[in-house]
Amino acid sequence: MSLSTSVIPLILLCILGRIVYQYFSRKVCIKRRKAYIDAFLLPNRVARKLKERYPHLDERNISDVFRELKEYFHIIRESKENGNEAFLSMPSQIVDGAWHEFILCTREYAECCQRAFGRFLHHTPAESMRNPAQMQEGLERTWRVACNREGIKPNDAAALPRLFALDAVLEIPDCHHYVLNREARAGSALVPVAPRDVTLDSEKKIHHASHIGCSAGCGGCGGGCGGCGG
């Protein structure tokens, strides 16, 4: 047996070993990131600022907001893990507000991004997007992942995912209010907004045109200043 012939099985074994190692390493990484998002606690400053802005919210309401921000992070994580790098729009005004406040805690936010996504999660305001259709596409992507995570059929939804329903449930002023198409009546002031199952009050759509669709995108992590206090 020649040397080259005897080396080939060894090379193939090394390649196979590397593939197996990468597969299980990825599984461990996914499990670790998922567990981190489930367990991490937002800084106290975020809750304090939300209560100042929305004084009618109680502790349970704030917990619901935090839960849905973490759910949005899971939606991003899951989408990226499945190879989808397209941006995902934020459907909730109150959750977006919590996200904004968390970003101001620069050190904590940067650490969360690194441990949850492996890179920095940028917040892209709707105003910087090219057109409303771009925001719409991002919202549809969020809708599909949110529905799948809650066992809802995206194209035949019997209920709204919690992330889409939260603003109305918490009675947030000038909120993003979604209803299912089957609830719309002919001639009512309802127009399509996300997937074909979801509609948005046309007045609110116009009123919130500059806010709907804040989105997330991952990129390189730059330096940051100090974090916020508890």
Residue ranges and their predicted role:
Residues 2-230:
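Acidic, Ser/Thr/Pro-rich intrinsically disordered cytosolic tails and loops
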